[in-house]
């Protein structure tokens, strides 16, 4: 896939989501765009494609299909004309929302939002491994109606990023939107071992994380902030707060939740999307702290 190709995914069934998107449902859920192509794509079994991950070497896409009843991961290959071909389809649980390849490109780590499970799927195995991390306290997985009333009544892991320490140990950071915390795991060959948690402010709702050297940037969906945390590598991995900064103007009083967070290729800028205010907050990274440059709609 060339650098100037974009694949856009869209929800096509709002009724089985754990949230309420704005707009209308689409008919064909995938759109491929580049300088020469505008192509709607459909793949057998593809519904509500919430997250797409490209293999860094192979012409393979991993697509997670989101549902409060049963999520799936599709493995899809493509040719030079971006014709998609389904290679595999596995069940993954309730509201699958995030995918991450490990550093060795041997396993796909999968996060479920509604039941808060994390699972590992070997890339060379047709039979996926069962959930490797279940919360000590039972997650009831409220129905859609009750969940929309209170998204923080129970645990909801939302994503996962891997971090390699100075001693070459693999660490996984998992933001839990429901409990306002960051889970910290040791990641060892098909296993996640809980080692610590970092508590955030109440009603933060941590969603996604971007990594820059020994710092992580967490976008908080519910209170529209970014928190900058330094990774402390002592006996047990911990986090230290460096900065909290808003993603919306001080005088804005309307509804807003944050979406994505990303650091650009130069590592000089960080961008956060706002949903409700319908804008992008752009920050300059200066010695790991953030300086707000603009909030553009």
Predicted regions and their residues:
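Loop-centered beta-sheet repeat module
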Residues: 171-226
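Blade-loop segments of beta-propeller domains
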Residues: 38-105
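Beta-rich, blade/repeat-based domains predominating
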Residues: 16, 46-56, 92-103, 107, ...
């Amino acid at each position: 896939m060339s650098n100037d190709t974009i694949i856009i995914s869209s929800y096509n069934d709002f009724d089985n989501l754990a949230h309420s998107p704005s707009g209308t449902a689409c008919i064909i859920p995938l759109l491929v765009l580049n300088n020469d192509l505008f192509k709607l794509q459909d793949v057998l079994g593809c519904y509500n494609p919430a997250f797409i991950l490209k293999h860094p070497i192979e012409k393979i896409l991993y697509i997670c299909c989101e549902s409060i009843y049963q999520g799936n991961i599709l493995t899809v290959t493509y040719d030079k004309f971006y014709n998609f071909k389904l290679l595999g389809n596995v069940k993954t649980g309730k509201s699958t929302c995030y995918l991450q390849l490990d550093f060795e490109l041997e396993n796909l780590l999968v996060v479920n939002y509604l039941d808060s499970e994390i699972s590992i799927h070997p890339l060379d195995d047709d039979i996926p491994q069962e959930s490797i991390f279940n919360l000590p306290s039972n997650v009831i997985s409220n129905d859609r109606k009750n969940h929309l009333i209170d998204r923080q009544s129970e645990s909801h892991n939302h994503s996962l990023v891997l971090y390699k320490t100075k001693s070459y140990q693999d660490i996984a950071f998992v933001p839990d939107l429901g409990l306002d915390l960051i889970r910290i795991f040791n990641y060892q060959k098909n296993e996640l071992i809980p080692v610590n948690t970092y508590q955030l402010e109440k009603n933060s709702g941590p969603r996604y994380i971007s990594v820059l050297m020994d710092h992580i940037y967490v976008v908080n969906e519910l209170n529209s902030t970014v928190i900058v945390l330094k990774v402390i590598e002592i006996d047990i991995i911990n986090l230290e707060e460096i900065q909290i900064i808003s993603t919306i103007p001080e005088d804005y009083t309307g509804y807003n939740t944050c979406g994505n967070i990303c650091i650009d290729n130069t590592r000089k800028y960080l961008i956060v999307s706002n949903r409700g205010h319908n804008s992008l907050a752009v920050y300059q990274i200066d010695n790991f702290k953030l300086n707000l440059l603009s909030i553009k709609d």
